[in-house]
Amino acid sequence: MSRQKKSKAVPVVVFLTILIAALAVLCFLIKPLVIEPQKDAIAKANADAKAAVEERNKKAEAEYKALIAELESEHNKPTNPDWPEHDPSKEWEILDLSNIPLENQTAETRTRADLFQYGNEMLLVNAWHSRPENDFNEAELKSVSKARSGDQKIQAKDNNVLLYPKAIDALELALKDAKAAGYTHYMVDGGYRSYKTQEEFFNARMEKLSSKYSGEALVEAAKKEVNYPGTSEYNSGLGFDLRLYDRNDPDVGAPKYSTTPEGKWMNENCWKYGIIFRFPQNAWPLETSTDKSFKTGVSVRLNLYRYVGKGNAAIMHYLDLTMEEYIEYLEEHPHIVLFENGTQKYEVYRQLVGDAPSFDVQLTRSTQSWETSLDNMGGLITVFNY
C-alpha cells in the first residue's frame, strides 16, 4: 500500500521540479526584457533628477553671486543720489554732506542724564571747556584692575585707577592685539580724577608757588602746571596714562615710554580701537607728530590717551586732528561720511542742542548701529557705523 502511494507521489515531485526549473528559466529570460529595462529607466530617472537639481543649484548659486555683487556695488556707492561721487581706489576718503540731510531720517529722544550715565566719549574737557558738574555721573566708573581677570586682566597702578567701561573695553582690545604682536608690560598709570582730587592737586601747586605769586597771578601760574579743577582730561573718566612696568624686571620701565617698541605700537595703532593720543607735540610721541599744544593748551609731555569712539578716532587720525580741531571741523562740516578702501565705514552728524535737558537725536534708518555724545560745545555728535 505504501509503495503505491510513493509511486503516485514521484510524478508530482518531478512535475513540481520541472515547473520550478521552467519558472527559473523564464525569469532568467524575462530579466533582460523586463527587469533590466525597469532598472535602467529608474537609474536614468534618478540621473535626470540629479542633473536637474544640480542645474537648479548652479542657477541659484549664479543668482546668489550676482545678487551679492549687486549689493556690494550698491554698498560702495553713495546711498543717496545727491551724495558726491567718491573714489573707491583711495585708502580713505571723507565726503562733506553738510548740505544733505540724513537719509531715511528718524529720531529718538535722549536726555543729558542718559548720555552722562556712561561717559560722553566726545565730551571736550580742557582749559576753556570745564566738565559740566551738575550733569556728570561717577556711578558707572569701574576699577581698571578689577574689571578683568585672568589673561584679560589689565595692569594698573592700583585698584583706585578708574575709567568708564567703554574706555576699559577699548583698551582691553588694544592690549590683546599688542600682546599678539609681541608687546606687553603696559600699565595704566593714571585714570579718573574727581573734582575734589583735582582741586587738591591745584591747591597744593598754588601753595608751592605762593612765595613767588599772589592773587590772580598765583592762580594763572598754577594753571600752567596743573589743570584747574574740572578742566583736566583726567576729569573726563575716559582719559588715562600708560607706561611700562614689570615688578620682576625694573629695567622694563627704564626707557622713555614713547621711545619703546611698545609705546610706538600703541601710538601708531590706538586709533583703531577708538583711542587717541591726547596731546601731540612736534615729533612727539611719533616722529610724524605735529605740535598741537596751541589747540589743546597742554605743552607738558604726557603719555595720556583718551577714548573717543572708533568712528571719531578714525577721522581724527586720517585728518590729523585733536579733539578740539575735530569739533571745530564738525562745526563747519556737520555731516560727513568716511569711506575706507571704497566702502562706507562711518557717517557723522552733528546737531546743535545747547544746554537742553532733553533732545531728539537725529538718526538714519540705514543702520541700527550708532553712538551719540555731547561735545561740551553745544553740539551732539552722532556716529553711524556701517
Features from the language model and the residues they span:
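Extracytoplasmic cell-surface/polysaccharide-interacting catalytic and binding patches
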Residues: 5, 11-191, 195-386
